[in-house]
């Protein structure tokens, strides 16, 4: 299993409505893209300073599932939209143990 993270910092002209629309599109990945096992996205809560403005986390079975996700039309459309909004973006992938507590939990958004 692997966790894919995306952290974005917005350009000054990005509107809250644009962010809400983008977040909704990202959350639909779990329904639209079979390789996405779990996905979360949202704006920074501004609890600490020097954070990104927006983050996305998605779980995949393996690197090939991440590759299929990266090539999926729904992901490509969101990536194109994101590219118009960001001043900077950082991506990171790391391994999750198969017995990690995050795996196998019901998705509260779908429940």
Which residue ranges define each predicted feature?
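Short, flexible helix/strand-to-coil boundary loops that buttress conserved ligand/catalytic motifs
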Residues: 70, 79-82
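Residues that form generic nucleotide/phosphate-binding pockets
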Residues: 25, 81, 85
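Interfacial aromatic-anchored transmembrane helix boundaries in multi-pass membrane proteins
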Residues: 88-89
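Short S/T/G/P-rich N-terminal loop/turn motif that feeds into the first structured element of a domain
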Residues: 1-53, 61-71, 94-111
């Amino acid at each position: 299993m692997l966790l894919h993270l995306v952290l974005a910092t917005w350009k000054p002209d990005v509107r809250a409505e644009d962010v809400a629309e983008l977040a909704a599109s990202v959350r639909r990945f779990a329904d639209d893209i079979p390789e996405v096992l779990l996905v979360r996205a949202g704006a920074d809560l501004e609890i600490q300073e020097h954070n990104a403005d927006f983050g996305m986390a998605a779980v995949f079975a393996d690197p090939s599932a991440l590759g299929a996700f990266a090539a999926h039309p729904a992901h490509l459309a969101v990536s194109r939209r994101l590219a118009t909004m960001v001043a900077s973006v950082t991506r990171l992938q790391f391994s999750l143990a198969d017995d990690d507590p995050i795996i196998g939990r019901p998705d509260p958004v779908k429940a």
